[in-house]
Amino acid sequence: MPHALWTVWVLGAVISLSKEGVPDQPSSLSCDPTGVCDGRSRSLNSIPSGLTAAVKSLDLSNNKIASVGNSDLWKCVNLKALRLGSNDINTIEEDSFSSLRSLEHLDLSNNHLSNLSSSWFRPLSSLKFLNLLGSTYKTLGETSLFSHLTNLRILKVGNIHFTEIQGKDFAGLTFLEELEIDATNLQRYEPKSFKSIQNISHLILRMKQPVLLPEIILDTLSSLEYLELRDTYLNTFHFAEVSDPETNTLIKKFTFRNVKITDESFDEIVKLLNYISGVSEAEFDECTLDGLGEFRTPDIDKIKVIGKLETLTIRRLRIPQFYLFRDLSSIYSLTERVKRITIENSKVFLVPCSLSRHLKSLEYLDLSDNLMVEEYLKNSACERAWPSLQTLILRQNHLTSLGKTGETLLTLKNLTKLDISKNSFHSMPETCQWPEKMKYLNLSSIRIDRLTQCIPQTLEVLDISNNNLNSFSLILPQVKELYISRNKLKTLPDASFLPMLLVMRISRKTINTFSKEQLDSFQKLKTLEAGGNNFICSCEFLSFTQEEQALDQILIDWPENYLCDSPSHVRGQRVQDTHLSVSECHRTALVSAVCCALFLSILLTGVLCHHFHGLWYMKMMWAWLQAKRKPRTAPQRDICYDAFVSYSERDSYWVENLMVQELEHFNPPFKLCLHKRDFIPGKWIIDNIIDSIEKSHKTIFVLSENFVKSEWCKYELDFSHFRLFDENNDAAILILLEPIDKKAIPQRFCKLRKIMNTKTYLEWPTDEAQQEGFWLNLRAAIKS
């Protein structure tokens, strides 16, 4: 038993040591090696136990945690980010965050905190971000919450129950990059509550009613740079100027987001912007203009310009009574100093000529995502309209003719940049007229399939991305930047068309290859973005991309965005990491080697066939098979001859005068087959030989020096040789008419040579006394 306890203790010690320094991972959390723990949306009712000093970031948002205790986080001394948003937290004990001196990010938004305590935040001297939006507290506490948060840069407070801003609320804060206050139902504002904050870069104020807004604005004039007003109904907004326009202000920008404006409140906004003389930019986003454009306030006539306003941005403006709206002529004079105007997605179909002429300082005009057509654009760009305009953006309107659009804009003498992308032009005329100073033209996403001389020669920047171009064959001598992504090109454009090119973007399934020669031909090219294409990873392409040392200096998205699409076995691999086999990369050499090997094999086979008479074997086999396959016109006949005699023409005297006499005139007579006498005239000689041998019981070869030299005797000997193998019999009778060396018989007739070596053959005797015995033996051999 003691031994078992000792073993358990040792194992426990080892496990404990192995876990030292690594954050404990309760089952409800997932932690990575860097100490980032994720416990979002896991229906947790409390903060998990077992958290250690190794935890650097803890996200427990979207759970059901109801409280935070003093001991829940006391070991997390290195914690930098704590997210407890969207829980049910209603209680936080006084010392819950006492050990979190390294904490920089704290999110307690959307909980049920009815009271806030300064003791929570007192230890958090490193805190930079604090979000307290969306609970149920009505004030920011009895004492200053943030007086010890000297490093705080982003603060978000307030909720729909928040009713009061007090003078002490922001004490101790001197500089904030962003302050967001949900003051939807704010009822009381203590004057000078923001005075303690010396600088606020961005104030986001959500207010339903604007009653307290003027007072807040006046309090922040000297400390605020950017004011954003959200979700406000300005029907009762009234700004009473307390003095001449304020010059000692920091505010540079106003944003009205989801704000409802009436004709009357518009007049008040104009007065406000005029009073805050430093405002240079005004933005209206998702706003509603609930009026008819009847701006009748007498004071507006006294205002010739709106302070220093230079930039006006309007996005998604809604005008419920759009078709009853007036022409805005009463405020034309207010626009003369505006330099930049953006009106997006607001159903603009016309800028009246008179308004265009009043926009004397306008340099930038963006009318994207509206209803402009060529006919109304002509009225907008009338003579003396927009005299200073340099940039015009008409993206995603209803323009349909490139020729008409260019001709309409000829009145804009200073226009250098034009964006008419995402219009439905579909085609490009052969020639066009454009303002003479045009340097930039955006024709992306206009569905054209070819380029013509319509493109102005003065361009330095051309964007023709996302079209249906199959080729680029247009000379543009001054173009320095070309954007041609998402087209149907196969390779880079010819460098001779673009001699001054510095930057080219040709990514996203536009090309499938390019070469070193093509890249080098662009002598001034400094930047190329060609990633995201379906590259054919050929051996040449891989060799170039992997051997070129300076490729990453030109290709700005190399190597991450360069992937192979083919061959299929390397699809999806990075071009930089892809390698093909020797057989794929040296196909010509491989084919040459195979051809050489094949040629040598054929040559060797030919030599062997010649040496071993292979050609003869094939020729004879073919002839034999052809003869065997020929249809028989007559029924199969029996043996017609006792013997077929194969002999040389020079030995015909011996055969015809001696052999024939002795055999055919013998009683009973033998029937011999002689080629001179019995071959059928007109029949193929080889067929005659084969038929005669097949119809004969035996084949007699009259061997002599003449026989060996005779070509036809060789044929007869050849086919007899096949018969020996075909029928496996000994039908051959050899007669040596004169002494002959066995070696004179060709070696390919192995069967005949074997017969001469293993069986008796007849030799013609010169002695007449022995000739009778010769004939006797021959007759016996034929009968056998």
Swiss-Prot record:
Glycosylation sites: 115, 199, 414, 442
Lineage, opening ranks: Eukaryota, Metazoa, Chordata, Craniata, Vertebrata
Cross-link (Glycyl lysine isopeptide (Lys-Gly) (interchain with G-Cter in ubiquitin)): 754
Site feature Interaction with bacterial lipopeptide, where: 349
Residues annotated as domain LRRCT: 525-579
A Pfam family annotated for this UniProt entry: TIR
Source organism per UniProt: Equus caballus (Horse)
Protein name, entry field: Toll-like receptor 2
Location relative to the cell: Membrane; Cytoplasmic vesicle, Phagosome membrane; Membrane raft
SMART domains assigned to the protein according to its UniProt record, in alphabetical order: LRR_BAC, LRR_TYP, LRRCT, TIR
Swiss-Prot/TrEMBL GO biological process terms: cellular response to diacyl bacterial lipopeptide; cellular response to triacyl bacterial lipopeptide; inflammatory response; innate immune response; toll-like receptor signaling pathway
Membrane-protein topology: Single-pass type I membrane protein
Family annotation (InterPro entries): Cys-rich_flank_reg_C, Leu-rich_rpt, Leu-rich_rpt_typical-subtyp, LRR_5, LRR_dom_sf, TIR_dom, Toll-like_receptor, Toll_tir_struct_dom_sf
Spans within the Extracellular topological domain: 21-587
LRR repeat start-end pairs: 54-77, 78-101, 102-125, 126-150, 151-175, 176-199, 200-223, 224-250, 251-278, 279-308, 309-337, 338-361, 362-388, 389-414, 415-437, 438-457, 458-478, 479-500, 501-524
Topological region Cytoplasmic: 609-784
GO CC terms of this entry: Golgi apparatus; membrane raft; phagocytic vesicle membrane; plasma membrane; receptor complex
Source taxon at top rank: Eukaryota
Family: Belongs to the Toll-like receptor family.
Post-translational modification summary for this protein: Ubiquitinated at Lys-754 by PPP1R11, leading to its degradation. Deubiquitinated by USP2.
